[in-house]
């Protein structure tokens, strides 16, 4: 075995990629014209193994199996491409400027300046969380940055160019977002960034499954080429795209999503990103203890932001049609969700029940309290005239684009 190791050391450099779980080779010499065009680093394949065995056999008889044992052993040092990239960047200092803010300005989000600043804030958290998940196997970036806008707006292209060229091969596009397969689970440990397209075409069940995948701490699956199941850390961060603004339909909450509607996006081909500046800043913030997760107040603000992206739910509409919250000194009345369901006529509706109605009342901010083991909600019933006036105000609001003079 020592002879094989010496032969390899004289001719090639090798490293074991901890992300792909494959050995890579860099040639110190070539063995003919057919190998002169090999890139600097190449994943070992049958042809390369056969070439090494052929050249080694010229010096002494050797079994292919012995060569494979050495290549698959700890003789080959381990290498983590993401950590190697980050740890070899030039250090970032505040004097160099806010490169992540500059990156955020390449995406012109719809809305006022506050919305643009919010995008910059969320992008920074998301990027630092992505770096944290690359550096620490215990960290999972469990929120998805989503860009919503028309086709041809560079949404997927922007995400595809977000990884630096040295890591570009670890970007994965999921075009059939409606299915999450075993192979998709394995990609969580094999890619640094996964882009899920057409999120707006996914059903609630599919979105919930995707949300569960986003929060998985590790993956215990057997790769096609492996002999054993392995517990692999969740490496991938998530991004997504869609065309329709209203795509969130989860009544249990939307804090896993960071959606923004875009007006336009600068082409990353015409205006390349400052990768070293962006990632050296994100890495520095991570090492400085920057809080990339959302606290309670930030989650509340995120939930308010996400309301514009939620699909209309009939239980919300029914409650808003028949009830409102007390104003001023109004006492209102405390009713259980089951009674409210009867009053709005929901007992004859297939997709509405008391549980959904209770969640909707809570989400809409109605006060509640427990009485004799039953949760009751403080509501005011709209009179017939008030219901008519409420409909008229809604129509005016729609016709004016949401602005009432």
How should these model regions be labeled?
Residues 288-331:
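Conserved alpha/beta core segments of nucleic-acid transaction machinery
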Residues 264-275, 332-405:
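Positively charged interface segments
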Residues 1-95, 114-117, 348, 390-405:
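N-terminal nucleic-acid engagement/recognition segments and initiation subdomains in replication
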Residues 208-230:
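Conserved catalytic/switch belt of AAA+ P-loop NTPases
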Residues 192-214, 248-253:
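Conserved AAA+/SF3 P-loop NTPase catalytic/coupling segment centered on the Walker-B
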Residues 248-267:
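A short helix-turn-beta junction within AAA+ P-loop NTPase domains corresponding to the substrate/partner-engaging
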Residues 184-189, 223-241:
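AAA+/SF3 P-loop NTPase mechanochemical coupling elements
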Residues 74-189:
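P-loop NTPase catalytic core of nucleic-acid-dependent motor ATPases
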């Amino acid at each position: 075995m020592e002879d094989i190791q010496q032969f390899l050391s004289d001719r090639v450099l090798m490293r074991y990629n901890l992300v792909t779980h494959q050995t890579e080779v860099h040639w110190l010499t070539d063995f003919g014209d057919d190998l002169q065009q090999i890139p600097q680093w190449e994943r070992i394949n049958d042809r390369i193994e056969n070439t090494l065995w052929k050249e080694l056999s010229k010096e002494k008889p050797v079994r292919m199996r012995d060569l494979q044992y050495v290549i698959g052993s700890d003789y080959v040092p381990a290498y983590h491409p993401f950590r190697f990239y980050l740890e070899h960047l030039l250090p970032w200092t505040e004097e160099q400027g806010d490169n992540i803010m500059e990156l955020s300005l390449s995406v012109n989000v719809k809305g006022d300046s506050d919305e643009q600043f919010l995008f910059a804030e969320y992008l920074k958290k998301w990027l630092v969380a992505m770096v944290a998940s690359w550096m620490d196997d215990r960290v999972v970036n469990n929120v998805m940055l989503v860009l919503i806008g028309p086709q041809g707006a560079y949404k997927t292209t922007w995400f595809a160019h977000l990884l630096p060229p040295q890591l570009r091969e670890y970007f994965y596009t999921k075009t059939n977002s409606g299915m999450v397969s075993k192979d998709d689970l394995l990609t969580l440990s094999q890619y640094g960034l996964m882009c899920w397209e057409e999120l707006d075409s996914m059903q609630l069940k599919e979105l919930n499954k995707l949300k569960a995948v986003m929060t998985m701490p590790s993956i215990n699956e057997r790769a096609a080429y492996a002999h054993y199941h392995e517990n692999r850390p969740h490496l991938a961060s998530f991004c997504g795209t869609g065309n329709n603004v209203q795509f969130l339909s989860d009544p249990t909450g939307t804090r896993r999503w960071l959606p923004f509607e875009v007006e336009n996006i600068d082409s990353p081909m015409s205006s390349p990103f400052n990768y070293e500046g962006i990632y050296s800043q994100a890495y520095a913030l991570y090492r400085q203890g920057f809080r990339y997760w959302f606290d309670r107040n930030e989650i509340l603000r995120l939930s308010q932001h996400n309301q514009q992206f939620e699909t209309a739910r009939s239980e919300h509409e029914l409650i808003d049609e028949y009830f409102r919250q007390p104003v001023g000194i109004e006492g209102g009345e405390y009713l259980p969700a089951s009674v409210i369901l009867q009053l709005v006529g929901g007992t004859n509706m297939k997709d509405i029940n008391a549980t959904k109605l209770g969640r909707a009342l809570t989400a809409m901010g109605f006060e509640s309290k427990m009485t004799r083991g039953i949760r009751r909600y403080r509501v005011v019933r709209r009179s017939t005239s008030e219901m008519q006036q409420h409909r008229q105000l809604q129509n005016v609001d729609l016709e004016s684009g949401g602005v009432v003079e």
